Amino acid sequence: DIANISSLTNPDIDVAKTRDVLGDPQTVNYVPFRNMMMLSIACAYAESVGASDVFHGAAQVDSQAGYWDGSVEFLEQINKVTALNRRDQIRIQAPLIDKSKQEIVEMGIKYKLNFAKTHTCYEGKEVACGECTACSSRLKGFVDAGYIDPVPYAKDIDWESYGCKSIEY
């Protein structure tokens, strides 16, 4: 039962915090073959509606965190598999796969993304925890870009001490 081996599918396993996973090649947050399953479903849907592209949200930090199915190598290999389709050619694209969180934040600001409508936290609650690895990575991206994340966090973030400014569109 794959639901029992990941902190993202089993509420009895604590979600890893940044301090817990440094140097760990495969964290407890890993869900076996998650991206492959979701991309397979997305490709099946794309074929059924005549779409030729599926977009995957993998970022540079995913492969750095040990998620093999968020890596450039995975993207290349899964595209080789989709190319075997004799009926419709569907290409999986991951435009953020080589981008840091800082670059993604900067890109979002450039295109006026409403970050308040995005959610990253692994805890699955309405208010982000600010401590899981996903929140830590997101927070670092905003700090490195010099902006205040408009998403509410369960812990206080002293944005001012980092010299961050509000996003203004």
Predicted region positions:
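Local cysteine-cluster metal-coordination motifs and their immediate loop/turn environment
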Residues: 40, 119-140
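A polyampholytic, Gly/Pro-enriched intrinsically disordered region
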Residues: 22, 112-113, 139-144
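ATP-dependent adenylation/nucleotidyltransferase module used to activate substrates
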Residues: 1-112
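Short Fe-S-cluster ligation motifs
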Residues: 136-138, 142, 148-169
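Structured loop/turn residues at beta-strand edges in well-structured enzyme cores
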Residues: 49, 116, 130
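Conserved S-adenosyl-L-methionine
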Residues: 2, 114-122
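Short loop/turn hinge sites at secondary-structure boundaries
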Residues: 124, 145-146
